Every structure is written in C-alpha cells, then in structure tokens.
C-alpha cells in the first residue's frame, strides 16, 4: 500500500498530463511514436494502451485510425484520456487486466514496468499483455535505463548533494529508485538493458527486440535546440534511428522499447 500511495501522490500532481509535450519528454514521445509506427499492424488495429497515462500516445494512435482502449490506475489520467476522440479509457491494473484473451493486435506497456519494483509483478504484467494479444500481434514495453538517474542528477547538478548521491549510487546497483523528494521522480524500477529480455522470455515472449529511444541525446537535445526546428529535429531522429539497435549504446539511453511478436 505504501508503494501505491507514493506513486499515486506523484501522479496526482498532474505533471504527467503534459510531460511528453516539452523538453526531454518531447524526444521520448517522438522516438516512441516513430518506432511504434514502424512496428504496429496497419490501421485499424485493436490497440490496448496499458498504463497509458493521460493519453499522449493514445491520441495519435486513434488519429492514425487504430481502435484504442486505454487502461490506467489513476482516475485523473483516465479522465483526461477519456476526453480524446476515439479513445476508450478505463481504470485498471497492468497485472490484472479485465480484458478477454487474444482481443488485441497490439498491447503497449509504456509506463507500468517503471513502477513495479518486484520482478514477479513485472513478469505478471507482461504475461497479461501476452494473454490479451492475438497471435501475430505485438507486445511493446518501455523501460527506464538503470543509469538514467545517474546521468540525470549529473546533468542537473544534484549529484553533489549527499542524499541525492546516496540514492543514485544505490539504484545503479539495485535498480530500485527510492527518491526523498518528488523532483527526483517517484518510486520506480530502472532496468539493466539485458534483464528486460529475460523478463519477456519468462512471460513467454521470445525473440524480443530492443530499441534505444533517445540514445545519449536526451542529455542535451532540449538545451541545444535540436527539438525546436523541423530540419534539426528530423536530423536528430535520423541519427538516433541509425544506432537504435546497437547494444553497446543501450545503457546511455534514458528509455528502451522492447518488442516481441506473440506466438
């Protein structure tokens, strides 16, 4: 219950509603969108957006012609997402989806795995995603890099603060992010790039492919103008696409997207 309360308190502040529209969040959004557009079945596909927040991705999915159902545990997020044309939004838990077997052609978990520190819960959420996805459909899950907190606190100058350094050093070892103030995010789990493939496999999702979303560009793109003009932004996206599946660079990316076809 403590875990749920800490995460709920963070999201009830409403910061997630507009996070993907500006700064680093915009780069995460653009790269998630372009990778998914390459991998999703042609529209109209039935897409389940699990932990879809306020509907940032559900909005463009619906605009692309997909049939979108969003599931999220936060009433505030469901309220916002439910107001988007073409999006059906309901309350729910990634570990216990109230959805029939093989009902969707794509199931997305673009947030839930961040907030499940227990591996068993993460595997359960992935199993549920596989269960509700028809054979031949895809399951795609986003994870935060084990090293994102370290680079984030260095870039923001907070690593020199003793308590920030303590929790940051600890999460590099354990993956569990235990913040003491909400400027440092909320309780979360940061994956080593290799362990998500093992979790997919344990859930019955084999031959998983990983995509580094922001690469190292999340450390500078919003400050150096790479997201302010069509030409510069297009060049940045081209560059990131060229190295998105280079394993030696996975750890520097803030987020990975892992995808598997349900068999």
Where do the model's predicted regions map?
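A short acidic, Gly/Pro-enriched loop at the edge of an enzyme's catalytic core
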Residues: 95-107
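C-terminal lobe and adjacent flexible extensions of AdoMet/dcAdoMet transferase-like proteins
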Residues: 199, 203-263
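Acceptor-substrate binding/catalytic loop of class I
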Residues: 116, 180-194
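Class I SAM-dependent methyltransferase SAM/SAH-binding core
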Residues: 48, 54-96
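Conserved class I S-adenosyl-L-methionine
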Residues: 1-43, 56, 60, 80, 138-170
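A short SAM/SAH-binding and catalytic strip from SAM-dependent methyltransferases
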Residues: 105-120
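A short glycine-rich, Lys/Arg-flanked "PGG" loop and its adjoining helix->strand segment in the class I
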Residues: 123-135
């Amino acid at each position: 219950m403590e875990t749920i309360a800490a995460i709920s308190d963070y999201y009830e502040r409403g910061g997630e509603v507009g996070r993907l529209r500006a700064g680093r969040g915009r780069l995460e959004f653009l790269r998630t969108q372009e990778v998914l557009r390459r991998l999703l079945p042609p529209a109209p596909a039935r897409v389940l957006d699990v932990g879809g927040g306020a509907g940032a991705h559900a909005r463009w999915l619906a605009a692309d012609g997909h049939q979108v159902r969003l599931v999220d545990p936060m009433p505030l997020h469901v309220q916002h997402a439910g107001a988007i044309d073409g999006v059906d939004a309901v309350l729910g838990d990634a570990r216990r989806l109230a959805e029939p077997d093989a009902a969707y052609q794509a199931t997305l978990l673009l947030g839930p795995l961040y907030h499940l520190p227990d591996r068993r819960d993460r595997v359960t959420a992935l199993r549920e995603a596989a269960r509700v996805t028809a054979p031949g459909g895809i399951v795609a899950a986003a994870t935060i890099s084990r090293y994102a907190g370290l680079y984030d606190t260095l870039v923001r100058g907070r690593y020199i603060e003793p308590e920030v350094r303590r929790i940051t050093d600890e999460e590099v070892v354990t993956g569990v992010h235990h913040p003491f103030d909400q400027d440092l995010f909320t309780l979360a789990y940061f994956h080593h790039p290799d362990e998500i493939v093992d979790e997919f496999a344990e859930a019955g999702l084999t031959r998983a492919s990983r995509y580094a979303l922001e690469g190292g560009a999340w450390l500078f793109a919003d400050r150096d103008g790479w997201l302010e003009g069509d030409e510069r932004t297009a060049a940045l996206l081209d560059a990131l696409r060229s190295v998105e599946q280079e394993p030696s660079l996975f750890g520097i990316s803030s987020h990975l997207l892992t995808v598997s076809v349900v068999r």
